[in-house]
Swiss-Prot record:
Protein's gene: TAS1R2
InterPro entries the record matches: ANF_lig-bd_rcpt, GPCR_3, GPCR_3_9-Cys_dom, GPCR_3_9-Cys_sf, GPCR_3_C, GPCR_3_Ca_sens_rcpt-rel, GPCR_3_CS, Peripla_BP_I
UniProt cross-references to CDD domains, sorted A to Z: 7tmC_TAS1R2, PBP1_taste_receptor
Role summary: Putative taste receptor. TAS1R2/TAS1R3 recognizes diverse natural and synthetic sweeteners.
Family per record: Belongs to the G-protein coupled receptor 3 family. TAS1R subfamily.
GO MF assignments: 1-pyrroline-5-carboxylate dehydrogenase activity; G protein-coupled receptor activity
Keywords, alphabetical: Cell membrane, G-protein coupled receptor, Glycoprotein, Membrane, Receptor, Sensory transduction, Signal, Taste, Transducer, Transmembrane, Transmembrane helix
Recorded topology in the membrane: Multi-pass membrane protein
Gene Ontology process terms (BP): sensory perception of taste
Name used for this protein in its record: Taste receptor type 1 member 2
Lineage: Eukaryota, Metazoa, Chordata, Craniata, Vertebrata
Length: 839
């Protein structure tokens, strides 16, 4: 503590040189315990470079601040109210000592005055735990720069300090400022309220203007950091020159203002956020009026959000919509009358225990200025006033607890700063229906309000239009705003218009808010919660049209009974089944006749039975595929059809052998007959077909699969094979080979006896099958949609009909209509005729 005390002692010389008598009872009220008050009754923004370190500026030479006097009156009112309250600090008189700090120009001298004892001396001690300064606590000052200056002194002595409007986040550092508390929400809450306001009205293209002091720079940086995490962009940021209203601007400063307003005119952004003390804005808004910059939305920081002097520039009503962020309004009963009460008309002050005081305790024009703005102040509600009011009450309640006043009497004793500070941290009471307590950072939970400037005679000049609650971090109670636009439409401030649903953003330039809107392609969608700059592909079972924000399920396509192609194929299959069944009955009844035996005898019944089974399998092609239906499609149906084709091929070969090869190769023919050559051949072909079927099923499986229709991606084709076309080629290969073999042997037997000459019928059946299969393969090579399944089934049924009617039909015709040709004698005569022709 010794180095710090030495520093205080050296500065204390300044205090003793500059002390002078007090002149006005506004600033002093004697009491058992004094509160120090620091208020800006006059303001000067520029540094006082002409003063040396022994000089303190005379605040009365600067511009009067009506708001500052209003806040000082709030402290006086609170102290008077507490002194008249028998339940709070009974028999204890609370006093005050208040000083005008000229905004930032006069802070060190008042704080030294408060720290000194009644003899204006600050003794150097090793331990200040038992030191009693002039005041027990300090209320103020109002801005962050001044608060930090004062807090650096007061924190050395743990003298409680409660600021009512400083919002800098640096003040939350309790290691650096252990004795500092505040009754105003921190800067990050003010910034968040602005951001939520902009998000609510979809303003993502803004301009930021800041003052050149710490307040402007810090808050501008906080806003920039917050916007870096969101979708709001800063078109540009400019620093306003520090110009006081009663000072002449330099040519450079004037040109700077002209340039800034010109830039505002040229920008497409129509929302302007301004972080600046009110005094620097007077000349700026005069330049805005001169250049007639209209149509903007001005968002005011708390430093000028409810400033009556700027509001008095009534021509601003034509410049756009003014919105401000400020502390909630809490009406204080009786304060409106007290604010304009002449202090000389009140009760005379008690004799001071000391005739010494400090300078800057006068404001001759404050009362008159307050009277001129009283209507505005009254209608606007008590906002920052309540922060001063609650700060005084917080100290009073802490002092009440420290003095043990809970039983109706107080024990008056010396109060050490650290003792009172400890009690202030613990206060928790209700004041005008609002809870007063401090969080670990020393902040009090007050919500913020968004106010709109209005200029109607009967209107609230600062009408509340929304509330911001820091704990929930959201706007509530949003009311209609009177926009200064055509038809009262909400102003638009966007670098780019919002993309429609299903459009991605293509960045243009360096700002994420500037972009082009590109439609998402079919099959993709835009998930805005994940990425607004890239369209995502739909899942494999879903699809989307162009410019969609979501995908829809693809329609599953398979043959259905209500479709016309399915009905046609079903009718053909029914016709084939009935005709084949009729042929089977006819052949059964005429089994012993030469016509049936020449057609193959028992082999015919095998073929007809397999044809019936094949017709019965046709319904498995209709409806959604299952494992069982896929098995029938891939195994049972191909096997039946292949055996039928093999029977025809073997039968053709057998007839040729009987009439042409038996005489030339008698030994081979004898083996063919002895070892049942036809059935062995058919068994071999059947086994070969079964092997190919098993290989195909092992390669592809039996579980139904889906594939996208290449002609209509909204459709997903359900099939039994992931590679339906290649599988069909593989299964058809052996059948095509057998058809070629059957056709070849039938052609070789074209000169055989008429009753055994089946070349025409086999040629018809095999040629039809070969042609239809080749056509199907050609169709499938060019088209891979759902029609492939329909064409495959149609061709299959037609091939079955070709065998049923083309091969067996003529024989039934002969049996039924030419029975005289179905006799052994007729067949023998035909064989004899063939033999005679050969000879």
């Amino acid at each position: 503590m010794r180095p710090r005390a030495t520093t205080i002692c050296s500065l204390f010389f300044l205090l003793r040189v500059l002390a002078e008598p007090a002149k006005n009872s506004d600033f002093y009220l004697p009491g058992d315990y004094l509160l120090g008050g620091l208020f800006t009754l006059h303001a000067n923004m520029k540094g006082i470079v002409h003063l040396d370190y022994l000089q303190v500026p005379m605040c009365k030479e600067y511009e009067t601040k009506v708001i500052g006097y209003n806040l000082m009156q709030a402290m006086r009112f609170a102290v008077e109210e507490i002194n008249n309250d028998s339940s709070l600090l009974p028999d204890v008189l609370l006093g005050y000592e208040m000083v005008d700090v000229c905004y930032v120009s006069n802070n060190v001298q008042p704080v030294l005055y408060f720290l000194a004892q009644e003899d204006d001396l600050l003794p150097i001690q090793e331990n200040y735990s038992n030191y009693v300064p002039r005041v027990v606590a300090v209320i103020g000052p109002d801005n962050s720069d001044a608060v930090m200056t004062v807090a650096n002194f007061l924190s050395l002595f743990l003298l409680p300090q409660i600021t009512y409007s400083a919002i800098s986040d640096e003040l939350r550092d309790k290691v650096r400022f252990p004795a500092l508390l505040r009754t105003a929400p921190s800067a990050d809450h003010h910034i968040e309220a602005m951001v939520q306001l902009m998000l609510h009205f979809r303003w993502n293209w803004i301009i930021v203007l800041v003052s050149g002091d710490t307040y402007g720079r810090d808050n501008g940086q906080l806003l920039g950091d917050r916007l870096a995490r969101g979708d709001i962009c800063i078109a540009f940021q400019e620093t306003l020159p520090t110009v006081q209203p009663n000072q002449n601007m330099t040519s450079e400063e004037r040109q700077r203002l002209v340039t800034i307003v010109d830039k505002l005119q040229q920008s497409t952004a129509r929302v302007v956020v301004v972080f600046s003390p009110d005094l620097t804005l007077y000349n700026f808004f005069n330049e805005v009026l001169r250049q007639n910059f209209t149509g903007a939305v001005w968002i005011a920081s708390e430093s000028w959000a409810i400033d009556p002097v700027l509001h008095n520039l009534t021509e601003l009503r034509h410049m756009g919509t003014f919105l401000g962020i400020t502390i909630q309004s809490v009406p204080i009963p009786g304060f409106s009358e007290f604010r304009v009460r002449d202090p000389q008309a009140g009760p005379p002050p008690l004799s001071r225990t000391s005739q010494r005081s400090t300078c800057n305790q006068e404001c001759d024009s404050c009362l008159n200025g307050t009277l001129s703005f009283n209507n505005v102040l009254r209608l606007s509600g008590e906002r920052v006033v309540y922060s001063v009011y609650s700060a005084v009450y917080a100290v009073a309640h802490a002092l009440h607890s420290l003095l043990g006043c809970d039983h109706g009497t107080c024990t008056k004793r010396e109060v050490y700063p650290w003792q009172l500070l400890k009690e202030i941290w613990k206060v928790n009471f209700t004041l005008l229906d609002h809870e007063i307590s401090f969080d670990p950072q020393g902040d009090m939970a007050l919500h913020l309000e968004i106010v709109q400037w209005q200029w109607g005679l009967s209107q609230n000049p600062f009408q509340s239009v929304a509330s911001y609650y820091p704990l929930q971090r959201q706007l509530k109670k949003i009311q209609d705003i009177s926009w200064h636009t055509i038809n009262n439409t909400i102003p638009v401030s966007m670098c780019s218009k919002r993309c429609q649903s299903g459009q991605k953003k293509k960045p243009v330039g360096i700002h994420i808010c500037c972009f082009e809107c590109i439609d998402c392609l079919p099959g993709t969608f835009l998930n805005q919660t994940e990425d607004e700059f890239e369209c995502q592909a739909c899942p494999s079972n879903e699809w989307s049209h162009q410019s969609e924000a979501s995908c829809f399920k693809r329609r599953l396509a398979f043959l259905e009974w209500h479709e016309a192609p399915t009905i046609v194929v079903a009718l053909l299959a029914a016709l084939g089944f009935l005709s084949t069944l009729a042929i089977l009955v006819i052949f059964w009844r005429h089994f012993q006749t030469p016509m049936v035996r020449s057609a193959g005898g028992p082999m015919c019944f095998l073929m007809l039975t397999l044809l019936l089974v094949a017709y019965m399998v046709v319904p498995v092609y209709v409806g959604p595929p299952k494992v069982s239906t896929c098995f029938c499609r891939q195994a049972l149906f191909p096997l039946c059809f292949t055996i039928c084709i093999s029977c025809i091929a073997v039968r053709s070969f057998q007839i040729v052998c009987v009439f042409k090869m038996a005489s030339r190769f008698p030994r081979a023919y004898s083996y063919w007959v002895r070892y049942q050559g036809p059935y062995v051949s058919m068994a071999f072909i059947t086994v070969l077909k079964m092997v190919t079927v098993v290989i195909g099923m092992l390669a592809t499986g039996l579980n139904p699969t889906t594939r996208i229709d290449p002609d209509d991606p909204k459709i997903m084709i359900v099939s039994c094979n992931p590679n339906y076309r290649n599988s069909l080629f593989f299964n058809t290969g052996l059948d095509l080979l057998l058809s070629v073999v059957g056709f070849s042997f039938a052609y070789m037997g074209k000169e055989l006896p008429t009753n055994y000459n089946e070349a025409k019928f086999i040629t018809l059946s095999m040629t039809f099958y070969f042609t239809s299969s080749v056509s199907l393969c050609t169709f499938m090579s060019a088209y891979n949609g759902v029609l492939v399944t329909i064409m495959d089934l149609l061709v299959t049924v037609l091939n079955l009909l070709a065998i049923s009617l083309g091969y067996f039909g003529p024989k039934c015709y002969m049996i039924l209509f030419y029975p005289e040709r179905n006799t052994p004698a007729y067949f023998n005569s035909m064989i004899q005729g063939y033999t005679m022709r050969r000879d």
